[in-house]
Regions:
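N-terminal catalytic cores of peptidoglycan-degrading enzymes
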Residues: 1-85
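Cell-envelope and extracellular/periplasmic
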Residues: 37, 89-99, 142
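SH3-family beta-barrel domains
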Residues: 172-192, 206-209, 218-219, 238-240
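Short alpha-helix capping/helix-loop boundary micro-motifs
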Residues: 197-202
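SH3/SH3-like beta-barrel fold
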Residues: 210, 223-227
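Boundary regions of SH3-family modules and the immediately adjacent low-complexity/disordered segments
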Residues: 226-240
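Basic/polar, cationic surfaces and motifs that engage anionic cell-wall
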Residues: 2-25, 97-178
Length: 240
């Protein structure tokens, strides 16, 4: 598995589809959001695209897990329009209900907002939802005869843009806090332990037991394990 510098580190699994093409030098300046019209995982999307000429760069399941399927440096086959696909990074979101609302879970929404902010930051995109293609956050239905991304997501685009911009506008906390130690319970099936407080640091281990751990220091959303093994992201824990 090869992860490129241009790809999101938020993706914890990767299934590389063969359904992609060159961007032909086109700069990325748009993000297109889709819904899956089903409650699928990233791997299930990958399997569907084995027999369909379609793809997206990322898929988010109903638990909020992000899977990458196409490198951002390539054009995914997302809206059957070379011009728009060449300019876009595309995201598929799982549904927890069917027609007519096609809702997505809170976990999916949270991951979607983080991913949109991450894509925008790395590609120097200013997140703007204008209700049309002049903005940078776009809907699938604007390019094809489809209801995608469904009524629920359709009404959330302004919210997604605002919340993603809050992440980008948040000042980086450069001060390491040293509070009294506290305990957390891991809520993720697999939580990476990193050498330092951030995804740019090397993975040195993984917690898979959903156990209780003591945190001795915090920095932003990261906590240092009492064992000294490293740091974990506190977004995937519950404070006790």
């Amino acid at each position: 598995m090869v992860i490129l510098m241009s790809d999101s580190k938020l993706a914890k699994s990767h299934y590389w589809t063969k359904n992609y093409s060159s961007r032909n030098g086109q700069k990325i300046d748009k993000i297109i959001i889709h819904h899956m019209a089903g409650n699928l995982t990233g791997k299930q999307c990958y399997n569907v695209w084995k027999s369909r000429e379609a793809s997206a760069h990322y898929a988010i399941d109903s638990k909020g897990n992000i899977t990458q399927l196409v490198h951002e440096s390539y054009r995914a086959w997302s809206v059957a329009n070379r011009y728009w696909d060449s300019r876009s990074v595309t995201i598929e979101c799982a549904n927890i209900t069917g027609s007519p609302t096609w809702r997505v879970s809170d976990a999916t929404m949270k991951s979607l907002i983080k991913l949109v902010a991450d894509i925008a930051k790395r590609n120097n995109i200013k997140i703007r939802y204008t209700g049309g293609t002049g903005g940078t956050l776009l809907k699938h239905k604007w390019f094809m005869s489809t209801a995608c991304p469904g009524p629920y997501l359709d009404k959330k685009f302004d919210y997604i843009a605002k919340e993603a911009n809050k992440i980008l506008d948040k000042k980086t906390d450069t001060t390491t806090k040293k509070p009294s130690s506290f305990k957390v319970k891991v809520t993720a099936d697999g939580l990476n332990i990193r050498k330092g407080p951030g995804t740019s640091y090397k993975v040195v281990g993984c917690i898979t037991d959903k156990g209780v751990y003591t945190i001795t220091q915090t920095k932003g959303d990261w906590g240092k394990l009492k064992s000294g093994e490293g740091w974990i992201c506190l977004d995937y824990t519950k404070k006790l």
